[in-house]
């Protein structure tokens, strides 16, 4: 057991269960969501460290604050979901807004909409109707897009971690050499260019270019469709991970225990795998949480650029068309994915760094 049962542990596990139930209920149904949420809460109460549960306790108010700010931003931006419809009188537009529960613009209207939305989300387990797709709910349109965005984000994160660790460790083992300069040059280039610029360049070279038309321009359905957008999302974070891994490797290789291991005659490969790689992984793993959030934000533009029918594309379409329910639905799902990944990182850090186990 991770620790004795305290009010913080109980409240933290309840918060984890509530957030899981809130997100899963529109996707898998009330019964399955309740079972999964209760199981998650029981596991959290028994095994999750107190510090992580304390963060989970703050998840509920932060989750609500994020939704509130999103609603207020939408209600202070000019435009209406029905403003683009031609040959529609003002009276008909007002009736449509009343039908979809959309009050007047402004702070008060945003507060009313936020209250109704949270009430329906908690009481009914629905994310609302999709305004621009008649007869379909937000859950209906986002559920098929969720595995697409998840697989794209996971592939990008794996590429960023693998490439960044490889370049960073090699540079850290050979500082001030051609390998080091080449790796850091890649890092500077990757950090300087945003994902959508990298994506456009990759599309021109490897999809539209006649000599190297290896990958499809846009769409989804085969492994080739995921390569270019995943590389575009991964490259900026691979560059940053390479810098972290290089610094961690240099720091570890100058420690006394590494010199002792070498003095005992351990092979260089074993020294690198047991000590250098572990020293490089610790700062990288701590960065994976912010990297996941950045990849989620970058996927909004990259999915639109490559025509991928994921959650990010629905978010952009919802923002352009003022489809408030779709925007809030995508915010909820993306926030839940980032929160879950940050939880995994928090649980993995004490396993990699023994110094953190006493603080858990």
Where are the language model's segments positioned?
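An internal, D/E-rich "acidic patch" concept
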Residues: 5, 103-165
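Generic hydrophobic transmembrane alpha-helix motif, especially the helices
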Residues: 15-36, 40-43, 62, 155, ...
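Membrane-water interface at transmembrane helix exits
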Residues: 21-25, 41, 45-49, 70, ...
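Transmembrane helix irregularities
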Residues: 77, 190-193, 296
């Amino acid at each position: 057991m991770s620790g004795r049962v305290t009010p913080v542990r109980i409240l933290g596990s309840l918060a984890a269960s509530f957030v899981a139930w809130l997100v899963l209920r529109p996707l898998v149904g009330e019964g399955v969501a309740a079972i999964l949420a209760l199981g998650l809460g029981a596991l959290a109460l028994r095994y999750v460290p107190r510090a992580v549960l304390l963060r989970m306790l703050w998840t509920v108010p932060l989750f609500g604050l994020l939704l509130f700010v999103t609603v207020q931003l939408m209600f202070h931006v000019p435009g209406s979901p029905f403003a683009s419809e031609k040959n529609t009188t003002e009276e008909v537009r007002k009736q449509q807004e009343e039908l979809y529960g959309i009050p007047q613009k402004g702070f008060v209207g945003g507060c009313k909409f936020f209250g109704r939305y949270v009430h329906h989300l908690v009481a009914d387990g629905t994310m609302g109707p999709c305004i621009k797709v008649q007869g379909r709910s937000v859950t209906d349109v986002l559920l098929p897009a969720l595995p697409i965005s998840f697989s794209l984000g996971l592939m990008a994160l794996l590429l960023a971690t693998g490439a960044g660790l490889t370049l960073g460790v090699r540079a850290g083992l050979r500082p001030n050499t051609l390998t080091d300069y080449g790796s850091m040059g890649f890092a500077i280039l990757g950090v300087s260019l945003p994902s959508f610029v990298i994506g456009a360049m990759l599309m021109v070279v490897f999809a539209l270019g006649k000599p190297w038309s290896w990958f499809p321009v846009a769409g989804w359905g085969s492994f080739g469709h995921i390569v270019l957008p995943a590389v575009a999302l991964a490259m900026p974070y691979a560059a940053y991970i390479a810098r972290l891994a290089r610094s961690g490797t240099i720091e570890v290789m100058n420690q006394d225990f590494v010199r002792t291991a070498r003095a005992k005659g351990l092979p260089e490969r074993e020294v690198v795998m047991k000590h250098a790689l572990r020293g490089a992984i610790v700062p990288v793993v701590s960065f994976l949480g912010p990297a996941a959030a950045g990849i989620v934000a970058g996927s909004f533009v990259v999915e639109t650029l490559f025509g991928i029918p994921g959650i990010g594309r629905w978010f952009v379409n919802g923002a352009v068309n003022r489809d408030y329910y779709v925007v809030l639905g995508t915010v909820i799902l993306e926030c839940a994915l980032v929160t879950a990944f940050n939880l995994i990182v928090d649980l993995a850090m004490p396993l990699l760094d023994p110094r953190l186990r006493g603080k858990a």
